[in-house]
Amino acid sequence: MGHFSSMFNGIARSFSIKKAKNINSSKSYAKEATDEMAREAKKKELILRSSGCINADGSNNLASVFSRRGEKGVNQDCAIVWEGYGCQEDMIFCGIFDGHGPWGHFVSKQVRNSMPISLLCNWKETLSQTTIAEPDKELQRFAIWKYSFLKTCEAVDLELEHHRKIDSFNSGTTALTIVRQGDVIYIANVGDSRAVLATVSDEGSLVAVQLTVDFKPNLPQEEERIIGCNGRVFCLQDEPGVHRVWQPVDESPGLAMSRAFGDYCIKDYGLVSVPEVTQRHISIRDQFIILATDGVWDVISNQEAIDIVSSTAERAKAAKRLVQQAVRAWNRKRRGIAMDDISAVCLFFHSSSSSPSL
């Protein structure tokens, strides 16, 4: 861990020094290049921003996406899948975003639209300024992605704060994003959406592995940070068990997550947009990954979710079936409580013929 830390700090330091020498021209060129990549990908139908399915020719990746509006007004969830991310055949970007507050649907869409391009720009810039040595290749690649995700989230949040047409003072969004590059998945999580992997156990059964932490305010490290910034964490009397973040004096905003983009009314009191960045090596046993908003996980367990997806006859309809099952579970388990927006992305790693039989 110490070795990785020093490597990560070295990459950050080295890149900052080199970047400072020619910051304006390099940044402008990188932005233009990534914008052009996004336009080309959209033309070739390699970017999906609505419910549906994407499976590019020659790719083992198949992504299924579905989102359903809840009972609280406009759907504030949104998602994106970008196959051939950055013009790399072995890369795919997936993200799911859960907005909240009066402007939440605008905030989630803004972050969804800006994050993939910003990340690609930061990754390419960092990569071009870094020499990858063979003995530490994997560690260095992770360090580069981690640095790129951190810089991206910082930039996206700052851009959102100064956006002229979106009021994100009392509104925000979570963001759960992954990049698959070859046989490695890089995961960045801001908020309480969740990534769950379906993998085949030694006994041959399909089991769920949770890859992310639900960043709730009552997690010890999150609560400590919030209280250290003079914020408060407590449950309302009519919501026992639902911990929320509050300002020092006012009874607002009452966020049910401890990390989010936007929500500047509480940013000085412990809410952060810093992602937790992790990686996972994909093996032949790993079948698919589910990214879903808390509307799914509030009523469906990790194991139930992978069982639903794996038993869906058509992979292209896997996300839709998962969401439909979550709706049924919500009506059964939370009768009388307004249903949340419910959204999911299911990314399958292998063609059905190459998957091990259970």
From Swiss-Prot:
Cofactor comment: Binds 2 magnesium or manganese ions per subunit.
GO molecular function: metal ion binding; protein serine/threonine phosphatase activity
Cofactor(s) recorded in Swiss-Prot or TrEMBL: Mg(2+); Mn(2+)
GO biological process: negative regulation of growth; protein dephosphorylation; regulation of microtubule binding; response to water deprivation
Residue numbers binding Mn(2+) 1: D98, G99
A Gene Ontology term for the protein's cellular component: plasma membrane
Top enzyme class: hydrolase
Secretion signal, residue range per the UniProt entry: none
Domain PPM-type phosphatase: 62-349
Superkingdom to which the source organism belongs: Eukaryota
Keyword line: Hydrolase, Magnesium, Manganese, Metal-binding, Protein phosphatase
Binding site for Mn(2+) 2: D98, D294, D340
UniProt-listed Enzyme Commission number(s): 3.1.3.16
Catalysed reaction, written as an equation: O-phospho-L-seryl-[protein] + H2O = L-seryl-[protein] + phosphate; O-phospho-L-threonyl-[protein] + H2O = L-threonyl-[protein] + phosphate
Stored SUPFAM superfamilies: PP2C-like (SSF81606)
Family: Belongs to the PP2C family.
Official protein name in the record: Probable protein phosphatase 2C 34
UniProt organism field: Arabidopsis thaliana
Lineage, opening ranks: Eukaryota, Viridiplantae, Streptophyta, Embryophyta, Tracheophyta
